């Protein structure tokens, strides 16, 4: 805008200057430059790429960029990070001369992102190639911290450690590699070399046998193990003035190792003299390292540590193709097998897992992050709470110091001199705590060089003595611990020795940066400033000396000397120093006491005094109960004005002892027993004791516990800390109780310094546990389950104590308290501990229980301060009408401690018991914990506070109990699912009570949808309250009321709705006592949990799915369904035990029983049918029981109903229950033989139903009430006028309902048929309810004018004028008959209206319409009735199907557009639904009637389709299964009737139609023929069983007359398969089977006779035949002879046998001694082949049936035929004596082949030729083999595929003994 204004400015004469580019434009320019640099790098133009990337780093916008936090996603810092990484790549490509620049780039990049393991890998690789093994090791270790599974860093670190020579670390890394890859060859080799102890003497051992080697690492100076001795020999042969050593890394440990290796006599360097000057060469010059550090400090700003590590956006924007991160396993195992690599990659975890926990970050810092703001401001020191790490030097600074020392001491006299200088240098320059390894090396070097000719300076001796003493504080740190004090004594003695020799003490202060020489010291002798310095340093030196001497005296148990030494030290520190500053002496190299002050010395002196008092005075005072005096005596000594950190706790063999700890324990006991309690001293005691224990455990140190430390000792210290934390909790409870009793709750209950100090120490405890235990679950998953329970408990106790300490301050706001609980909950949840731990009562979830109690007390306090009723409601659904007293009562019930048993854990002394009692009192009065002081806040702040409390409560209850009241989605923030969130498995009844009281207000105010959310919780509670107490169940008044057989329902039903009915039925419910007495008994039996019992079951019943209709069909019929119904009803019955007058429970219970009856009958009608229902009596019993219980529940509901609508509804339900018992429906009744008996019970139910419908109608006039009353009037036999008037009233109340219209005119039809055509009164009544008004007028006119039955006619008859009387009576009869027809047609017309249009599926009216037509009996009425009802049983696709649909009153049909008769334009629609059982009943009733109509109309085809369709119908086959035989009987009856009518007309029976159908029916349904013949619908002479079987024999005879061999074979096979089971056979069916077999046999004989050649053979022909068959003269041929007795049979009708004989005798009479020389003629070959197969089937399948034995077969010579010698017994004639089936098979075989063989040969041939051919392309037809003359050659058999076993010993029957035909 400014530029535009400047351009448009025409008046200004000055030239405008453009503005600077925006920050976004500059960032874009830098991104583009970075992109160009990447392209140049990709193109290998390294110089240009270097120029571009350096320009990015030098840009001012990059150098001046600042961010607040490291997590801030800053584009510029991403760009800077990537530029540094790629610039390092450029330097690497430029060569080794640029390696230092690349190193600097990597160091700067690491400052930006220290979590990039790939970057650490590059840095380590580069520094290794430069010889910087220390930096390389550091880099690879940091890379593993970032990514613990990084193979690159792991393997490279192993090689660097080999190069360094660190054997212990090398073995650890090798084991780490083997844990991830057990077959790693290099790691196995390294581990074997290090652990190998069997090497030869004087040979390299352990790590000395290894050389570093890695494909991607370069080592500048590899150790030559094999050439080492040769080099040493070479150096020993010539004099050398200086020995050079290569320092692998610039560290104290490396330098000390070289010196020790020279001076130690057992080292391999024994050949080198320790007095030869040595030169130490560094791998990298000090200048380069220092320069790199300076460059780093110059380039990297203070905000560089805040750079975000996310660089993916830069990569996308720049579009560069340079890959920023290399793969973890890239080219690391070139010789690895593919299968091994795949397995390794499959088991590899994603890289993200390595970054989930930042190992470089102290995990305990989260404690301060969460809780720092909640520590009271006074006395809180962040360093004391969370930052406990001693300052140690980093590798780079140590590298610089070591390098400086080496450079300064190049001129030396050998190893001894170098070691002496080194010890002096460290003693003066040490400003940090030395590592353990460095300290041990220093002490070892000191021992080796102790007796060198030059003495140590006193400062050096004092330094060494302090170092030895510091190690003695942890005796387990060094193997020779007892010798430490000897060494301390030695060095102190050396100091005295040097002083006694007047050795000038070097006064150079240890804190200065340079070391003074002797000459420089002398130059300061005359200067005043130097004198002051000398005075201070001298005092400092001797103060340190006397302090150490005092400590040594205490260890020697010389306390007097120790006191003397302390006083001397105090005198030195007490003198005035330089200026006014307090005297402070630094001891930076010591771990424990790092500084000496006056307060420290005074504290130690006080401890000596306390020790004296504990040994002499205190025990006697405690014994005499002088508790206050003890407190006054010890408190000033233990608690001086300024607090002192503890120095030591003495460790003995028996355990841990300390004078201070002993004094504190005595003082604590005295405070507990003194009256009143000195709160400040009491709390200070616990604060100081916890402080001493924490410092004794070493929690203030960051040094890793060495491997040689004693685990038992550490555990004992931790146990003491945990016990003290528990004691602090008891202390807080006692202090609170004491202050509450004194009435000082309005003031500060404890000193803020004391409270803040304990809070800081508790934070320290929590931080220590997090640092040393909980962090392991992230860094080492194997230890995730190894966290000790004591650590968890201690952590939780510390958190609870921290929170309770805050509550002691009355000035803390309520919001502050709630926020602290929320923070602590989040913190505990982070480590999965929010639900862990046990409180004093042994209940799980100690913190959550404490939090819930406090939050509910706070909530009550806040709500009581709100005057408006709107403020009372919880956000989770408390009703607005809930008053303040109810809220208070609810909260108190939740918070009252239920467990009064405090004897679960025995106390060690009386004081602990007293503390437990007071804590119990405090827990019972939690609601008083909130101070009366209430802040004046705005209404909005109160609402916000309320919401905060509710959210905290919701989360606590969700974690502890699994409660989630927020599933409705109305809350913005969902509840967090923590690691150990409860799933609602409550362990005790007390837990259930707490939860239930919490949710009760919400549940009462919720709808069913809200209760569904609580279903899981309510179920969990019910596990502990599964049923009421046993004494209530034993005398269960509800069950007795529901099942009492002596209860008179009729009386109750009569009194229902009257005044006093509730009292009457209550007496029936509780007969022996009053309602008040019953409630008192409930209180006595369920007192502790009465509220739970009183509400649980009702709420659970409302939340559960109590309706079985939602289950799968038929569910209620199963055992599971019965149990489901019982469980649901039990819930309401249990509730009614405690709330006997709850209307909702009675009503719902009655509905459940009614629904069970409905489902039982509906599902029973569909899934069991009538027959199955009769077999299961238990189902009928369930129906009757549920009906009775439903009626009684509804009667009780009626007594409790208040409004008229409720009473009307209950009356209607009761009436329907009674009415349902009256209906003749399935599955109780089958509409055929089983019908309801209209006995006294039936009549009583009718009357009760009528009564309740009448009462319901009086409350609310509903058309259905009048409708049912009309039907009941008909059942009770009331006058026609009453029932029709009810229907008329129903039609008036609901003009659109079709139900009353249908029922009105259906009843009129029934009455017209029942009363007859001459009942004047009935006709008059029926005429008044005509559908058509014109017919009504006509009928009434005729009835009014008729003379039939009038008084005048009767008078004439009395006077004797009979002829006139008869004439007038006949005329009246005709008129009445006309009226009857008019009314009948009117009713039919009305029913026709009920099935028009969209009401076409209103099947009730259609059935009544068909019934009316059928009963009218007109000429075409039968056909019309069938056509009308056929709508329900046919469709456009099928001639018979059940085309009916269940009437549903909920779905309103469309309105008719066509007006009805007489202008009736009412739009009728269905209003009453139809039950499934009623629908199935209608189907059955209509089906029976429709089958009758089909039979009477002789519709055979539809009947045939009917019974087939009924069996296969998927929907209704089971429902109408018992009606299928009825349909078959109707079908058979129709067939028989049809044949009888044809026979009477003289026609011939057609076996292919009716007879064939009867036979097919016999095959399919023959087993039920006896039942069919005895059905009432089919019983008659024409359908008797014998008559039906006669038709079967006729069918067989017809087939035999027509010689249908194939058909006879088929029916034989069907009969054999159908009746092979003896149970399905009877005498009639057996006769049919024998007849069919005989007919098949005779048909085969006739067919064979028809194709057998009959021409005679002359002698010439006979002789001519012989040569053609191989010139054999004895060839025999088959001769066939049939006898005349062929047609005689014992079970056939003689007339039928005569018919067969007359037809086939001429054919069979020709077969007399016929010789078969050749096969049949060509035209009959196919027939012969078919007959051969049929004979073979007859041979296989024919059972033991008596067959005609008049078939004779012979073998004869051809020459005997002309001579007439073919007689049995003659020479050359052999009789074939086999069975008839075998004879037929031989006969057919001979006709087909022209020759005959043995029976076994024929059978074998048939077996092989009737099997399927397996060979591809083989023909399926039989091949007739060529037969040579005389029969010597047999047919070649086909390949045998399947073995077939032929019965009747087929191979045993031979045809003769002729050799020409072998078997």
UniProtKB/Swiss-Prot annotation:
UniProt tissue specificity: Expressed at low levels in seedlings.
Domain of life of the organism encoding this protein: Eukaryota
TPR repeat spans: 30-65, 81-116, 118-150, 543-576, 602-637, 866-900, 955-988, 990-1009, 1011-1031, 1143-1183, 1226-1263, 1264-1297, 1306-1339, 1377-1412, 1508-1541
One GO cellular component, as annotated: nucleus
Complex and partners: Component of the HIRA complex made of UBN1, UBN2, ASF1A, CABIN1 and HIRA.
GO terms of biological process kind: chromatin organization
Keywords, comma-separated and alphabetical: Chromatin regulator, Nucleus, Repeat, TPR repeat
Annotated Polar residues bias: 1818-1832
Described purpose of this protein according to its UniProt entry: May be required for replication-independent chromatin assembly.
Region annotation Disordered: where it falls in the sequence: 315-361, 894-941, 1813-1840
Biased composition (Basic and acidic residues): 894-923
The keyword Nucleus is annotated on this UniProt entry: yes
Protein name: Calcineurin-binding protein 1
Consequence of gene loss (knockout): No visible phenotype. The double mutant hira-1 cabin1-2 has aborted and fewer viable seeds.
Localization (cell): Nucleus
Chief location of this protein within or outside the cell: nucleus
InterPro entries: Hir3/CABIN1 (IPR033053), TPR-like_helical_dom_sf (IPR011990)
């Amino acid at each position: 805008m400014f530029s535009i204004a400047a351009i448009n400015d025409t008046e200004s004469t000055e030239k405008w200057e453009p503005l600077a580019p925006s920050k976004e434009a500059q960032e874009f320019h830098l991104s583009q430059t970075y992109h160009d640099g990447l392209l140049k790098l990709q193109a290998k133009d390294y110089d240009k790429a270097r120029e571009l990337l350096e320009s990015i780093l030098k840009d001012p916008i990059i150098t001046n960029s600042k961010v607040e936090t490291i997590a801030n996603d800053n584009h510029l810092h991403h760009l800077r990070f990537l530029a540094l990484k790629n610039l390092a790549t450029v330097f690497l490509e430029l060569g080794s001369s640029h390696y230092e620049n690349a190193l600097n780039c990597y160091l700067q990049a690491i400052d930006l992102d220290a979590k990039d393991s790939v970057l650490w890998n590059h840095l380590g690789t580069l520094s290794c190639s430069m010889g910087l093994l220390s930096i390389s090791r550091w880099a690879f270790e940091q890379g593993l911290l970032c990514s613990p599974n990084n193979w690159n860093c792991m393997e490279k670190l192993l090689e660097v450690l080999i190069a360094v020579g660190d054997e212990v670390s090398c073995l650890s890394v090798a084991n780490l590699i083997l844990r991830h890859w057990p077959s790693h060859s290099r790691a196995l080799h390294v581990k074997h070399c290090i652990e190998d102890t069997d090497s030869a003497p004087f040979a390299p051992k352990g790590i000395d046998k290894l050389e570093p080697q890695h494909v991607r690492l370069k080592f500048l100076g590899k150790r030559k193990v094999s050439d080492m001795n040769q080099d040493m020999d070479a150096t020993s042969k010539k004099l050398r003035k200086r020995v050079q050593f290569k320092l692998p890394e610039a560290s104290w440990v490396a330098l000390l190792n070289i010196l020790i290796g020279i001076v130690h006599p057992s080292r391999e360097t024994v050949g080198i003299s320790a007095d030869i000057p040595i030169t130490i060469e560094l791998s990298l010059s000090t200048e380069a390292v220092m320069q790199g550090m300076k460059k780093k400090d110059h380039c990297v700003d203070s905000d560089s540590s805040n750079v975000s590590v996310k660089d993916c956006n830069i990569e996308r924007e720049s579009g560069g193709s340079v890959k920023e991160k290399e793969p973890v396993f890239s080219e690391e195992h070139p010789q690895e097998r593919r299968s091994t690599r795949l397995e390794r990659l499959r088991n590899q975890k994603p890289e993200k897992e390595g970054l989930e926990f930042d190992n470089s970050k102290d995990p305990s810092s989260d404690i301060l992050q969460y809780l720092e703001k909640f520590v009271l401001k006074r006395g809180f020191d962040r360093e004391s709470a969370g930052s406990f790490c001693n300052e140690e030097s980093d590798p780079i600074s140590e590298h610089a110091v070591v390098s400086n020392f080496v450079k300064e001491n190049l001129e030396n006299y050998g190893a001894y001199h170098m070691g002496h200088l080194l010890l002096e240098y460290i003693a003066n320059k040490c400003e940090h705590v030395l590592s353990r390894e460095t300290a041990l090396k220093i002490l070892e070097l000191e021992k080796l060089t102790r007796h060198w000719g030059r003495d140590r300076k006193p400062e050096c001796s004092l330094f060494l003595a302090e170092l030895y003493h510091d190690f003695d504080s942890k005796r387990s740190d060094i193997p020779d611990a007892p010798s430490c004090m000897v060494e301390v004594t030695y060095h102190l003695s050396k100091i005295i020795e040097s002083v006694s020799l007047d050795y000038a003490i070097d006064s150079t202060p240890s804190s200065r940066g340079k070391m003074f020489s002797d000459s420089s010291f002398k130059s300061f002798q005359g200067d005043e400033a130097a004198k002051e310095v000398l005075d201070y340093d001298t005092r400092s030196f001797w103060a340190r000396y006397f302090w150490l001497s005092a400590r040594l005296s205490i260890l020697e148990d010389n306390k007097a000397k120790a006191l003397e030494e302390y006083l001397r030290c105090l005198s030195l520190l007490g003198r005035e120093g330089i200026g006014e500053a307090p005297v402070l002496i630094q001891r930076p190299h010591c771990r424990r006491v790092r500084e000496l002050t006056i307060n420290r010395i005074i504290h130690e002196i006080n401890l000596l005094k306390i020790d004296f008092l504990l040994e002499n005075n205190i025990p006697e005072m405690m014994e005499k109960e002088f508790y206050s005096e003890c407190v006054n005596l010890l408190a000033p000594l233990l608690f001086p004005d300024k607090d002192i950190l503890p120095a030591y706790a003495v460790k003995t063999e028996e355990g841990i002892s300390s004078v201070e700890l002993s004094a504190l324990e005595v003082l604590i006991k005295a405070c507990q027993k003194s009256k009143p309690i000195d709160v400040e001293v009491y709390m200070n005691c616990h604060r100081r004791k916890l402080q001493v224990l924490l410092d004794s455990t070493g929690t203030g140190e960051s040094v890793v516990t060495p491997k040689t430390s004693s685990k038992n000792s550490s555990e004992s210290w931790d146990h003491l800390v945990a016990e003290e934390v528990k004691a602090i909790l008891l202390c807080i409870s006692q202090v609170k109780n004491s202050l509450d009793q004194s009435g000082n709750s309005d003031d500060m209950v404890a000193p803020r310094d004391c409270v803040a100090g304990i809070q800081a120490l508790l934070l320290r405890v929590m931080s220590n546990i997090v640092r040393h235990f909980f962090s392991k679950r992230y860094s080492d998953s194997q230890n995730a389950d190894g966290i000790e329970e004591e650590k968890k408990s201690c952590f939780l106790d510390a958190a609870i104590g921290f929170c309770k300490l805050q509550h002691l301050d009355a000035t803390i706001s309520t919001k502050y308290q709630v926020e602290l609980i929320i923070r602590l909950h989040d913190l505990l949840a982070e480590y999965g501990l929010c639900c862990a731990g046990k409180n004093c009562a042994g209940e799980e979830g100690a913190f959550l229980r404490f939090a819930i109690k406090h939050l509910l007390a706070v909530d009550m306090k806040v709500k009581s301060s709100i005057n408006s009723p709107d403020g009372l409601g919880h956000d989770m659904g408390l009703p607005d009408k809930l008053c303040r007293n109810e809220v208070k009562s609810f909260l108190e019930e939740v918070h009252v401690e239920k467990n009064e048993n405090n004897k679960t854990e025995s106390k060690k002394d009386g004081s602990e018991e007293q503390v437990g009692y007071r804590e119990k009192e405090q827990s019972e009065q939690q609601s008083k914990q909130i101070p009366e002081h209430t802040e004046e806040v705005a209404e909005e702040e109160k609402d916000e506070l309320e919401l905060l409390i509710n959210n905290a409560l919701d989360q606590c209850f969700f974690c502890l109990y699994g409660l989630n009241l927020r599933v409705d989605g109305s809350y913005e923030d969902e509840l967090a699912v923590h690691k150990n969130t409860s799933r609602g498995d409550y362990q005790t009844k007390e837990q259930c009570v707490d939860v239930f009281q919490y949710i009760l207000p919400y549940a009462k105010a919720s709808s069913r949808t809200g209760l569904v959310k609580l279903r899981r919780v309510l179920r969990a509670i019910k596990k502990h309250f599964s049923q009421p107490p046993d004494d209530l169940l034993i005398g269960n008044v509800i069950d007795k009321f529901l099942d009492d057989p002596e209860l008179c329902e009729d009386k109750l039903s009569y009194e229902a709705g009257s005044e006093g009915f509730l009292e009457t039925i209550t007496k029936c419910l509780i007969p022996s006592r009053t309602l008040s007495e019953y409630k008192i008994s409930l209180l006595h039996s369920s007192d502790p949990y009465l509220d739970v019992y009183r509400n649980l079951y009702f709420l659970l019943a409302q939340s559960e799915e109590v309706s079985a209709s939602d289950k799968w069909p038929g569910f209620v019929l199963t055992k599971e369904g019965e149990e489901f119904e019982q469980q649901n009803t039990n819930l309401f019955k249990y509730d009614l035990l405690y709330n006997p007058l709850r209307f909702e429970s009675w009503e719902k219970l009655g509905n459940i029983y009614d629904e069970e009856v409905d489902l039982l009958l509906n599902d029973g009608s569909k899934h069991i049918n009538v027959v199955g229902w009769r077999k299961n009596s238990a189902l009928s019993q369930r129906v009757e029981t549920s009906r009775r219980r439903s009626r009684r529940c509804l009667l009780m509901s009626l007594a409790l109903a208040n409004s008229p609508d409720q009473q009307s509804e209950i009356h209607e339900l009761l009436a329907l229950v009674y009415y349902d018992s009256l209906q003749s429906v399935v599955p109780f009744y089958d509409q055929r033989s089983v019908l309801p008996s209209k006995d006294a019970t039936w009549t009583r139910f009718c009357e009760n139903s009528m009564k309740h419908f009448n009462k319901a109608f009086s409350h609310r006039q509903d058309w259905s009430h009048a409708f049912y009353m009309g039907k009941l009037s008909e059942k009770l036999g009331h006058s026609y006028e009453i029932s029709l008037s009810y229907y008329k009233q129903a039609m008036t109340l609901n003009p659109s309902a079709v139900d009353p219209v249908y029922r009105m005119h259906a009843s009129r039809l029934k009455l017209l048929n029942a009363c007859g055509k001459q009942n004047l009164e009935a006709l008059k009544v029926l005429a008044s309810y005509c559908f058509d008004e014109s017919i009504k007028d006509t009928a009434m006119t005729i009835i009014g004018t008729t003379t039939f039955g009038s008084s005048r006619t009767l008078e004439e008859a009395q006077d004797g004028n009979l002829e006139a009387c008869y004439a007038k009576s006949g005329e009246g009869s005709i008129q009445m008959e006309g009226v009857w027809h008019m009314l009948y047609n009117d009713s039919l017309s009305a029913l026709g209206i009920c099935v028009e249009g969209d009401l076409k599926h209103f099947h009730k009216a259609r059935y009544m319409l068909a019934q009316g037509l059928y009963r009218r009996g007109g000429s075409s009425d039968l056909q019309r009735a069938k056509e009308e009802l056929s709508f329900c049983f046919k469709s456009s696709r099928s001639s018979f199907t059940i085309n009916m649909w269940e009437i549903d009153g909920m779905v309103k049909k469309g309105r008719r557009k066509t007006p009805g008769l007489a202008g009736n334009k009412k739009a009728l629609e269905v209003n009453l639904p139809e039950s499934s059982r009623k629908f199935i009943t209608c189907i059955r009733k209509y089906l029976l009637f429709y089958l009758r109509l089909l039979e009477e109309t002789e519709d055979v085809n539809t009947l045939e389709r009917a019974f087939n369709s009924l069996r296969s119908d998927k929907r209704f086959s089971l429902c109408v299964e018992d009606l299928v035989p009825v349909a078959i009987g109707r079908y058979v009856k129709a067939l028989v009737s049809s044949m009888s009518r044809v026979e009477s007309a003289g026609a011939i029976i057609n076996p292919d139609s009716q007879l064939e159908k009867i036979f097919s029916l016999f095959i399919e349904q023959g087993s039920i023929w006896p039942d069919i013949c005895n059905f009432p619908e089919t019983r008659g002479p024409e359908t008797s069983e014998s008559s039906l079987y006669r038709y079967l024999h006729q069918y067989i005879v017809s087939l035999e007359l027509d010689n249908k061999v194939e058909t006879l074979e088929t029916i034989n096979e069907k009969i054999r398969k159908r009746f092979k089971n003896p149970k399905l056979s009877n005498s009639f069916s057996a006769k049919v089977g024998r007849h069919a077999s005989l007919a098949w046999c005779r048909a085969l004989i006739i067919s064979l006779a028809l194709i057998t050649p009959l021409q005679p053979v002359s002698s010439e022909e006979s002789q001519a035949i012989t040569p053609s068959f191989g010139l054999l003269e004895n060839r025999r041929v088959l001769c066939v002879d049939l006898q005349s007795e062929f047609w005689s049979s014992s079970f056939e009708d003689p007339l039928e046998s005569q018919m067969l004989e007359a037809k086939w005798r001429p054919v069979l009479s020709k077969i007399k001694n016929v010789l078969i020389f050749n096969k049949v003629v060509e035209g009959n070959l196919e027939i012969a082949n078919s007959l051969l197969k049929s004979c073979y089937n007859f041979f296989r399948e024919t059972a033991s049936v008596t067959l005609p034995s008049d078939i004779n077969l012979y073998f004869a010579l051809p020459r005997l035929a002309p001579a007439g010698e073919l007689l049995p017994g003659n020479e050359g004639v052999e009789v074939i004596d086999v069975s008839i089936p075998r004879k037929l098979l031989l006969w057919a075989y001979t006709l087909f082949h022209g020759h005959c063989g043995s029976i076994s040969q024929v059978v074998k041939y048939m077996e092989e030729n009737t099997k399927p051919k397996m060979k591809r392309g083989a023909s399926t037809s039989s091949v007739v083999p060529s037969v040579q003359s005389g029969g010597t050659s047999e047919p070649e058999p086909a390949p045998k595929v399947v073995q077939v076993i032929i019965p009747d010993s087929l191979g045993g029957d031979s045809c003769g003994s002729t050799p020409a035909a072998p078997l």
